[in-house]
Design a protein with these regions (language model features):
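A short C-terminal boundary segment appended to hydrolase-like catalytic domains
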Residues: 322-372
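Extended active-site neighborhood of metal-dependent phosphoesterases/phosphodiesterases
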Residues: 93-227, 241-262, 266-267, 275-278, ...
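C-terminal motif of bacterial Sec signal peptides marking the signal peptidase cleavage site
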Residues: 20-23
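Structured segments of extracytoplasmic/periplasmic soluble domains
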Residues: 56-62, 72-79, 108, 112-115, ...
Length: 372
């Protein structure tokens, strides 16, 4: 930063203080000019650190809908700026990928987001770990191909999944003081519709506590102004699947992961107990910004971004209190974050196009700002 030196008069240079310069008798001190010398550089304004990112999910179909959302996000990022994106799972329908050279890497990721020249941090979803079209989540080992693609020679370099669950801070520069810390969580082994008993590595009875301990430790150690977890499965949702602990009305099924209770337990003992700021997720194919609930510290806000391709109607639009929600339309969220504010915009596509005003500027369906 350039320092501004205000020049003083020649008298001051000679060592005479303005306070000592007086006329004869008891006259008042002589006032010296403080006008800067022409050509003196103005001080460089201090830039307010900020982070801008998009959130989308349930996208990986390689169809017209996904391509349209990808184009809309690229258009918005060109107009408003984006540092990176986060993807909330179900990155590849219906049964994930089978290798780092699977053709879906091109059809359902590289091509739809070819004009998004930013890193994208995905979470794993139930369809990423499935063997059947219902997305039962019985083959969690499949998700490891998505981890491996991060360093694959065939990758464009946009895909960032160094582990099934991990954390990163933003701004992405290692030298920057973090404004946000993101915790990418692996919810699928804790909410599988039909868990596979042979997958001992991903058994919820051991995988859940291990991930929980990591998350608690990382969240407690965070120095960031804002904390954000993102995952595929919700804690609460007004979409078709509903709230964790009763996914799809699954209370009738045997105790296990079907109802999402192990996932709810993890969130209760970490995000809810420790005051996480935001949870961003997918699984339901709509857009929601839900209010805090008493069961989760009455502080954490919940943002569902699962309209990245094919969409659905709400399951129960009144199940949880919402600031705003939209079903049956493709869309995504854009966020701008500073040390004191967290602003989110819900962008809903119309006729598979980004909605803009007469001047070509984006028109969000809903905007909310949270301050600290």
């Amino acid at each position: 930063m350039n320092r501004l030196y205000t020049p003083i008069s020649t008298l001051a240079v000679l060592g005479l203080s303005a306070g000592l310069l007086t006329a004869c008798g008891d006259s008042a001190p002589i006032s010296l000019p403080t006008t800067p010398v022409p050509g003196t550089p103005a001080p460089t304004p201090i830039a307010t650190p900020k982070v801008r990112f998009i959130a989308f999910g349930d996208a990986g179909r390689g169809n017209e809908n996904q391509n349209a959302v990808g184009a809309a996000m690229a258009q918005l990022c060109k107009l408003k700026g984006c540092d990176f994106g986060i993807e909330t799972g179900d990155n590849f329908y219906e049964v994930g990928v089978t290798s780092v050279t699977d053709t879906q890497w091109q059809t359902a990721f590289e091509l739809p987001y070819k004009d998004l020249n930013i890193p994208i941090y995905p979470a794993l979803g139930n369809h990423d770990n499935a063997d059947t079209d219902v997305g039962e989540g019985a083959n969690n080992a499949k998700g490891n191909f998505q981890v491996d693609y991060t360093t694959s020679p065939g990758s464009s370099g946009k895909w960032k999944m160094p582990a099934r669950y991990h954390a990163f801070t933003a701004p992405l520069s290692a030298a920057a003081t973090p404004l946000i810390e993101f915790f990418v969580l692996d919810s699928s082994p804790l909410a599988a519709t039909l868990p596979n008993p042979a997958e001992t590595e991903y058994n919820y009875l051991t995988y859940g506590p291990t991930q929980l301990q990591w998350f608690q430790t990382a969240l407690m150690a965070s120095k960031a102004k804002w904390t954000v977890a993102f995952s595929h499965h919700p804690y609460i949702s007004n979409g078709e699947h509903g709230n964790a602990g009763n996914f799809d009305g699954a209370g009738m099924f045997p105790v296990g992961t079907t109802d999402g209770q192990p996932w709810k337990d993890l969130m209760d003992e970490s995000a809810c107990a420790m005051g996480l700021d935001f949870h961003i997720f997918g699984h339901d194919h709509d857009l929601e910004w839900l209010k805090p609930v008493a069961s989760c510290n009455a502080k954490t806000e919940f943002i569902l971004s699962g309209a990245g391709s094919d969409v659905r109607a709400f399951g129960d639009a009144t199940l949880n209190p919402a600031y705003f929600q939209q079903d049956l339309a493709q869309g995504f969220f854009w966020f701008e974050v500073t040390a004191t504010s967290f602003t989110g915009e819900m962008h809903v596509l119309k006729d598979l196009k980004l909605q803009v005003d007469a001047a070509g500027q984006p028109m969000p369906m809903f905007t909310r700002t949270v301050t600290k």
